[in-house]
UniProtKB/Swiss-Prot annotation:
Keywords: 4Fe-4S, Amino-acid biosynthesis, Branched-chain amino acid biosynthesis, Iron, Iron-sulfur, Leucine biosynthesis, Lyase, Metal-binding. It comes from Phenylobacterium zucineum (strain HLK1). InterPro entries: 3-IsopropMal_deHydase_lsu, Acnase/IPM_dHydase_lsu_aba_1/3, Acoase/IPM_deHydtase_lsu_aba, Aconitase_4Fe-4S_BS, Aconitase_4Fe-4S_dom, IPM_dehydratase_rel_enz, IPMI_cat. Its cofactor is [4Fe-4S] cluster. This is 3-isopropylmalate dehydratase large subunit. Binds 1 [4Fe-4S] cluster per subunit. The lineage of its organism: Bacteria, Pseudomonadati, Pseudomonadota, Alphaproteobacteria, Caulobacterales.
């Protein structure tokens, strides 16, 4: 009998019952926010049900919070719908005794930054949230994925979830990347390789020497974008780097419980003889700094490359999609992607708003300042830390002063311009170099044009005024 994959082991450890090819899984951690919970709590109220495990639930305010003036509190939020959602969340969590990091609390921030930062995310766990990028937590060897509002209600009521088991895929990234290439480039390269539907029906385990060399924050970036490849979740087996990241965090085990946890966590890895349903291998040395050119995360090109022609695609549907994307993005087939001028630069989101992301961007900006360069004229650039604690750390290191000296806006934490649900939005026709995870039509604002890239690449674009090769700034 073949060995088990990491996914198999986590699944088996959480099955409560099985029937007709489906299972009831126990959920270790439920993360909630203001957008996907109002109806779920209303359903509990109608049914007269309590929250089953408030202690395994954590709430934050992130999606539609403004990134300025948070100290004024929820009641001062200008947008009526956003204010109501935030007020409703505060009322619901107070009623059910759920820990809540609200606006103005230094611990608050984007849910997928806060969970790991607090040590709530741990190896071997099952983690769900009403947000598709819950896959971020897979960087710790946790089975983590998004759920819908009706499932949010079910987990609140029962601490379980009905699931059908996915297939196993392994993506190995081997070798040493070139300078200027990192986790975001890996993620975009994987999506470019398999497409946005390539992972459908799978849970992806990332492995290989280049993945092992990533920091925990880099691993979170890689797992975050798994959903853009169509997969249910992304996983990376825990190792010494994982344990070092977790040790001493507020919710991490302490004392003797830490040693017991380590013994347990070390069992969560794929066996050597485990069989994967699909396996893909990428050479890190062949991955260049990467950006998107179109309106799907699979529309990727090396920064040194050209915008593709619709005629280069193999099917009529793909050709039509590419033609539409070029029209929407205001690009011409065959033009160098570096000719695309940018109006806005956004450094933030659950993909790239952690301290290492800000350090990488600030390093590019600092070098530009040494040469007398700042944010290019006509470019609006903003940096939005992923949490209040990230913001504090960045300010302690002086990163905020670097950004502000170059002309960047330094904001308060939140999802911000990742999605058009708060005041940070693109105007129609504006082009944005963004460190977020989705470049769909209108994602950052109606008519906005989004190019996904790494924090360092986004910083380079802000200085150059157009998409630029970060290696020219190193």
């Amino acid at each position: 009998m073949p060995g088990k994959t990491l996914y198999d082991k986590i699944w088996d450890a959480h099955v409560v019952a099985e029937q007709d090819g489906e299972a009831i899984l126990y959920i270790d951690l439920h993360l909630i926010h203001e957008v996907t919970t109002p109806q779920a709590f209303a359903g509990l109220r109608v049914a007269g049900r309590p929250v089953r495990r408030p202690d395994r639930t954590l709430a934050v305010a992130d999606h539609n919070v403004p990134t300025e003036g948070q100290g004024l509190g929820i009641d001062a939020v200008a947008d009526e719908e956003a204010r109501l959602q935030l007020q409703t969340l505060a009322k619901n969590v107070a009623e059910h005794g759920i820990e809540f990091f609200s606006m103005g609390d230094v611990r608050n921030g984007i849910v997928h930054v806060v969970g790991p930062e607090q040590g709530r995310t741990q190896p071997g766990m099952t983690i769900v949230c009403g947000d598709s990028h819950t896959s971020t937590h897979g960087a710790f060897g946790a089975l983590a994925h998004g759920i819908g509002t009706s499932e949010v209600e079910h987990v609140l009521a029962t601490q379980t979830l009905r699931q059908k088991k996915a297939k196993n895929m392994r993506v190995r990234i081997e070798g040493e990347p070139a300078p200027g290439v990192g986790a975001k480039d890996f993620a975009l390269a994987v999506i470019g390789e398999i497409g946005t539907a390539g992972g459908t029906g799978y849970v992806i385990e990332y492995a290989g020497s280049a993945v092992r060399a990533l920091s925990m924050e880099g691993r979170m970036t890689l797992c975050n974008l798994t959903i853009e490849g169509g997969a249910k979740a992304g996983l990376i087996a825990p190792d010494e780097m994982t344990y070092a990241y977790l040790q001493g965090r507020p919710a991490a085990p302490k004392g003797g419980a830490w040693e017991m946890a380590l013994d347990y966590w070390k069992g969560f890895h794929s066996d050597e003889d485990a069989v994967f349903d699909r396996e893909i291998v990428l050479d890190a040395a062949k991955i260049a700094p990467t950006v998107t050119w179109g309106t799907s995360p699979e529309d990727v090109v090396a920064v040194t490359g050209l915008v593709p022609s619709p005629d280069s695609f193999g099917t009529p549907d793909k050709r039509a999609s590419a033609a539409r994307a070029l029209e929407y993005m205001g690009l011409t087939a065959g033009q160098p992607i570096t000719e695309a001028k940018v109006d806005v630069v956004f450094i933030g989101s659950c993909t790239n708003s952690r301290i290492e992301d800000l350090r990488a961007a600030a390093a590019i900006v600092a070098k530009a300042l040494e040469g007398g360069r700042k944010v290019a004229p006509g470019v609006r650039a903003m940096v939005v830390p992923g949490s209040g604690l990230v913001r504090e750390q960045a300010e302690a290191e002086g990163l905020d002063e670097v950004f502000k000296a170059a002309g960047f806006d330094w904001r308060e934490p939140g999802c911000s311009m990742c999605l058009g649900m708060n005041p940070d939005r693109l105007a129609p026709g504006e082009r944005c170099a963004s460190t977020s995870n989705r470049n769909f039509e209108g994602r950052q604002g109606r008519g906005g044009r989004t190019h996904l890239m790494s924090p360092a690449m986004a910083a380079a674009a802000a200085i150059a005024g157009h998409i630029a090769d970060v290696r020219e700034f190193l």
